[in-house]
């Protein structure tokens, strides 16, 4: 089970280590982290002031497989680009921009299982967005939950009806905060059947 966390440096770098450590604990697998580069804002819609998450995931797949005819190194920092030579494992990008997809006004994150790529944005996960007092622990908790949720999709898991499960689909921040940082027994069994994760969890 190979998972790479691409942490765009426009998102506070100090959060990348605790997020990767908590993701690793939730998934019970090591997370490889790169956090010193900037990923292009693919699919930016000036009217909405958001990025199309589907286009971003497609670009991410092109980037990680290094297809020079489609993704030029000059699109981003060359040293950052060179650190991702032929990565074929599953990838989670953390980007600073607000995201949408064609059928939704916004998304906290999105996964593209066929490509093995996923993206999460902390844009609407911070307390400040809702006029609340800043709290890094809240933000870390939400990024981890949403990140683990999208990684679950990359391994073929569907949405779960258990409101406490990682795979429950949150409609808003309240739903996300209500979730726990674990997979329910059913989802855990499904995940373990697709990966090397142990089935015993709860």
Feature locations, PLM:
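Propeptide-to-catalytic entry region of secreted or membrane-anchored zinc metalloproteases
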Residues: 1-104
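Generic, low-specificity signal for short hydrophobic/alpha-helical stretches with a mild N-terminal bias
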Residues: 5, 102, 133-134, 149, ...
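Activation segment
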Residues: 101, 155-156
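Metalloprotease/metallohydrolase-associated module, dominated by Zn2+-dependent proteases
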Residues: 107-142, 157-202
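Sparse, context-dependent recognition of short Cys/His-centered cofactor- or disulfide-binding micro-motifs
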Residues: 16, 77, 105, 131, ...
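Catalytic glutamate of the conserved HExxH
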Residues: 146-154
């Amino acid at each position: 089970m190979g998972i790479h966390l691409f942490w765009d440096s426009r998102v506070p770098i100090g959060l990348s280590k605790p997020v990767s450590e908590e993701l690793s604990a939730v998934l019970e697998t090591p997370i490889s982290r790169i956090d010193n580069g900037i990923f292009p804002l693919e699919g930016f819609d000036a009217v909405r002031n958001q990025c199309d998450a589907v286009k971003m995931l497609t670009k991410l797949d092109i980037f990680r497989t290094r297809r020079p005819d489609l993704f030029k190194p000059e699109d981003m920092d060359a040293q950052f680009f060179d650190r991702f030579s032929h990565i074929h494992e599953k990838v989670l990008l953390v980007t600073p921009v607000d995201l949408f997809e064609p059928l939704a006004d916004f998304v906290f994150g999105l996964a593209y299982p066929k490509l093995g790529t996923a993206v999460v944005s902390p844009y609407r996960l911070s307390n400040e967005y809702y006029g609340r007092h800043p709290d890094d622990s809240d933000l870390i908790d939400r990024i981890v939950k949403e990140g683990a949720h999208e990684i679950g999709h990359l391994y073929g898991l569907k949405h779960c009806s258990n409101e406490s499960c990682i795979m429950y689909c949150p409609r808003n921040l309240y739903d996300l905060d209500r979730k726990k940082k674990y997979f329910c027994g059913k989802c855990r069994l499904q995940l373990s059947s697709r990966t090397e994760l142990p089935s015993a969890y709860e």
